[in-house]
Amino acid sequence: MPNPGNVIGGHKAALHNPNVSEETKQREKEYLEEHEGEVGEEHQKNTGNVRGGYKAAMHNPNVSGEAKQRAQEELENLE
């Protein structure tokens, strides 16, 4: 059985693909509107990985101060 998150991602990708016709893009948009919110709880992002990503961003010297502040805020929202 396909991962619903991957299926939704494929439809979203089609919307941004310049090789896809406008007619197909319209169908993809309608599909996404009809199936909004259907990705089940078991397919949500792993909270531990998300938390680790924010912590890594806060300690990465290549990340701007503004982005570090946002990562800190998002991390606080997770807890």
UniProtKB/Swiss-Prot annotation:
Q: Name one Pfam family in it.
A: Con-6
Q: Which GO terms describe its cellular component?
A: cytoplasm; cytosol; nucleus
- The UniProt annotation puts the region (Disordered) at 1-79
Q: Domain of life here?
A: Eukaryota
List the residue ranges forming a coiled coil, or say none: none
Give residue spans, biased composition: Basic and acidic residues: 22-45
Entry's family note: Belongs to the UPF0654 (con-6) family.
Q: What is this protein called?
A: UPF0654 protein C11D3.01c
Q: What is the lineage of its organism?
A: Eukaryota, Fungi, Dikarya, Ascomycota, Taphrinomycotina
